[in-house]
């Protein structure tokens, strides 16, 4: 759908890795910890198609002002999620793949060159903050470099905390379901068990757990065993 209509895409934290980082119309993560261009696009869009989104406070912020210039189409397989946090204009309850396939078959190709150029220009001028030059290790630079070393096949698991958001922001996800994190419940100590489960399911792919001091403290006893 995005390719046919030249529609930009942004993701919530739970949606990261569903779109390859190098896709030309991908704007990155939205919300409190998101990229400036993703938030700019949402604020200035005249149509927002939300797929499986719950519009958490980290995404929507002030829910009464979220994308208030746009018509919102909310697609979700669970009817109870529709307009739960942010009121939508059109609700479509069902399987996202089937609904989007129907969209693709019904809509004509579009370009939206002016809108696309505006976002490209904005992204070029205002991006995520880059680590400062110096001899100190910056977590953002560490995460960015980690992707270079691991490549696109790795699955990244995080615990909960600042490291989680830095990993969400700066790691570059190329394959679906390569970012695993407890974003909704925010359960510290989640990471080790999740990483073991992921490795069991994908024994031939690199699996890396990125954790913080609090979450590490919750799992020290398991590591000692």
Q: Which residues does each PLM region occupy?
A:
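Short, solvent-exposed amphipathic alpha-helical segments in soluble enzyme
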Residues: 1-6, 63-68, 90-91, 170-175, ...
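Glycine-rich, acidic loop regions that bind phosphate or pyrophosphate groups
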Residues: 15-118
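Conserved catalytic cysteine-centered active-site region
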Residues: 10-23, 172, 202-204
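Active-site diphosphate/adenylate-binding microenvironment
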Residues: 120-204
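General beta-strand structural signal in soluble alpha/beta enzymes
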Residues: 10-12, 50-51, 94, 134, ...
